[in-house]
Amino acid sequence: MKYTYQYKALPSTEQKLELNVWVRTCQYWYNRQLGDRFDWWERNRSPVNACPLITPLPDLRERPNYYSQKKYLPEIKKQPATVEWSGETLDFSRVPANTLQQVCKRADLAFERFLAGDSSGSRSGKPRFKSQSRYRSLIIEGAGLDLNSCSIGGRYLYVKVPKIGLVKVRSHRHLPDGAILKQ
């Protein structure tokens, strides 16, 4: 049987600063992917009732999807990206690759729901670009997560997060023996 537990992390000040950099980088990457998808959507769609009989066709390109956008991650991690409107420099190499891949999955899911709709066929609204106040979560998963079962009075656990170190986690519910961390 699979269980899902959520615990509150209590990072130190240095860890909070690093996690804020991660969230900002993931927010930029999400918005960039969404912008690429909207650009594709605007260039490749044509309303049937408004199209003239003779019109030049623009160069069509492949539809961006999870895999096509994920393959750009190694190139982006090589050099820092500069945000055009703020001049901010973001270093993608500071964020674990699997976290950025989860951002790709998040953007793909939002755009697919917009195009295809849910099981009843009703389409959701156009996905929004996320501001810093709207993008406040990220998923850290993979082989780098280790659970150190040293608890202080049964109240705290320590989770080893890649590129950050040990993060203190409040243990409000006991983990079963042999528990494996996935995310």
Q: Which functions belong to the PLM regions below?
A:
Residues M1-Q183:
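Nucleic-acid substrate recognition interfaces
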